[in-house]
Amino acid sequence: MKKTAILLLYYFLLIGCNSFINSKESDLESLQLKSSFIDLEENNLDFSKFNNGKVVVSFWATWCAPCIKEMPSIKRAEEILDDYGYTFLLVSDETIDKISNFKNEMNFDLKFLKSNKSFESIGVYAMPTSYIFDENGKIVETFVGVIKWDSEEIINKLKAL
């Protein structure tokens, strides 16, 4: 009984995590319709500028130890996959000041963004949660939990997409 309850909970969490998808737009466009994203200089980010490349959007928080743990491997993966057209975007729903202070204190050279809506309102219920979008803006992979982004297995998977 306990096992069934856990499986049902997991199933509903996965369904919830993909709830931002709208069949009329690409998954990436649908995500942007649900929320607006700004960079640390408070410029709006238009996801259409990534139409010809692959995008990894990772949802995280400054208080999330597993999120912080995977950031160095995200940076290494970004460098390894430079010739494969990948852009890595790290999205938080915290304040610009909090994200900027975190970036400066941790000295992470990554693309940090702020979502203007709470994660729950766009269907993200666990952190870190990462979505990989192909060149057409379609979700091709979803990861919930810590990923060793620079592992041979993940790098090969991303190269093959």
Predicted feature locations:
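Conserved redox-active cysteine motifs that mediate thiol-disulfide chemistry
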Residues: 59-76
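Thiol-/selenol-based redox modules, centered on thioredoxin-like
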Residues: 132-161
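Short pre-active-site segment immediately N-terminal to redox-active cysteine/selenocysteine motifs
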Residues: 53-55, 59-63, 95, 126
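Bacterial N-terminal signal peptides
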Residues: 7-15
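N-proximal helix/coil linker or "cap" segments that precede and/or mark the start of modular domains
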Residues: 14-34
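Positively charged n-region of N-terminal signal peptides that target proteins for export
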Residues: 1-4
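A short beta-strand-turn-helix
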Residues: 34-55
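Short, internal strand/loop/helix patches
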Residues: 89, 100-135, 144
